[in-house]
Amino acid sequence: MEHSFKTIAAGVVIVVLLLQQAPVLIRATDADPLQDFCVADLDSKVTVNGHACKPASAAGDEFLFSSKIATGGDVNANPNGSNVTELDVAEWPGVNTLGVSMNRVDFAPGGTNPPHVHPRATEVGIVLRGELLVGIIGTLDTGNRYYSKVVRAGETFVIPRGLMHFQFNVGKTEATMVVSFNSQNPGIVFVPLTLFGSNPPIPTPVLVKALRVDAGVVELLKSKFTGGY
């Protein structure tokens, strides 16, 4: 009888602990909307984990539709050889509170979308043309395992939330992909820019120790990112 009571008590404790964690799990994605639409008022000074809503009477049908990613940008406009056309809440106010956004990325031959992280979203993508090497790096839990595949037109990929990843055009022609996120504002952390182009700069001795190189190498790398991406 005593053993049975201890078993039940242990079970109750486990359930209570799981229930305590439930709010944390729920907050792992964008909050659920409380109305059909909440077109973002980008001029409003009120921002509480999102944007204030425009009055329904001020939001026409156009907030449901966008042609922004119908065409891409100049793939030679930056040293990466790629161009990102964003379609997050800042560019498409209609997605406010809906927990979704999209990007189009165009690549020159040999162009890359450098190693980066989306801290607030999982990413799902499809290659529209060309062929892209998609690389994903796991956490220490996986021994920093590197997963990769050449993804061709019509094929898809998924990037788990928060994992470092990149895309690289391995073809001889331009390539294009469209990606979707389960957040209206997925965020992005470019690893090279974060390390060597932060404002203010990360102290050189910190990077010397972390990267196991001399100060000259660190200063050279910092000089490459003074103007951002």
Swiss-Prot record:
Query: Which amino acid positions bind Mn(2+), per UniProt?
Result: H116, H118, E123, H165
SUPFAM superfamilies reported in the protein's UniProt record = RmlC-like cupins
Looking at the record, the residues that make up the Cupin type-1 domain are: 67-219
Q: Main localisation, per the record?
A: secreted
Q: What protein is this chain from?
A: Germin-like protein 3-6
Q: Which organism is it from?
A: Oryza sativa subsp. japonica
Concerning Pfam families, the annotation shows: Cupin_1
Gene Ontology MF term list: manganese ion binding
Give a short account of what the protein does: May play a role in plant defense. Probably has no oxalate oxidase activity even if the active site is conserved.
Q: Which UniProt keywords apply?
A: Apoplast, Disulfide bond, Glycoprotein, Manganese, Metal-binding, Secreted, Signal
Question: Which InterPro entries did the record assign?
Answer: Cupin_1, Germin, Germin_Mn-BS, RmlC-like_jellyroll, RmlC_Cupin_sf
For this chain, the family text in UniProt reads: Belongs to the germin family.
Q: Tell where it localizes.
A: Secreted, Extracellular space, Apoplast
